[in-house]
């Protein structure tokens, strides 16, 4: 196990790891226990009661965070002609087809999301092994394979995030920055949680949301009551 810094250990002392905090309490505590001098990112980890090895229990989706992530995502678009012009006008950070694929094959990965028009997907498939493991492969289910590149770019730049369960049945997503006020963090958390609950596979048995933790990138994970799905802005446990 990696050795923890003194700042991390001091922050961890403020947390009762045997307690399940309300989302609002966790948001406040995450900000208090951040050991970063920068504007730290606030993250959520969720353990689900699914078996990702089964195709019918793969949980994935998208959510438009009402207050964004605090970061303007870098978006690339695979498109040509008129659609390429639309993507550039919408604010895409890089637009292209073969040239963009070659850059990525050469090791360039300085972007947060990738969009493709349907006619470009056969070409983009050549770099699926590069993009897929990083969660960057365009997919119709997440709205990133589309002819409406203007909307897709605007959605992602505006705070749309993707979530996908990993092999250990965990989901990880961002809900904002430490500079956000507590209510905005909680409202972003609630929006994401609602989508995750809607994405519950019909074949999943038993408890669906098994564990939730909130933390900053460098801070300790704060255990959150997974049963708190309503009245999230209430401070008291209930």
Swiss-Prot record:
Residues 227-238 have a biased composition (Basic and acidic residues). Part of the 50S ribosomal subunit. It comes from Rhodococcus jostii (strain RHA1). GO terms for biological process: regulation of translation; translation. InterPro entries: Ribosom_uL1_bac-type (IPR005878), Ribosomal_uL1 (IPR002143), Ribosomal_uL1-like (IPR023674), Ribosomal_uL1/biogenesis (IPR028364), Ribosomal_uL1_3-a/b-sand (IPR016095), Ribosomal_uL1_CS (IPR023673). Belongs to the universal ribosomal protein uL1 family. The keyword RNA-binding applies. Keywords: Repressor, Ribonucleoprotein, Ribosomal protein, RNA-binding, rRNA-binding, Translation regulation, tRNA-binding. This is Large ribosomal subunit protein uL1. GO terms for cellular component: large ribosomal subunit. It holds the Pfam family Ribosomal_L1.
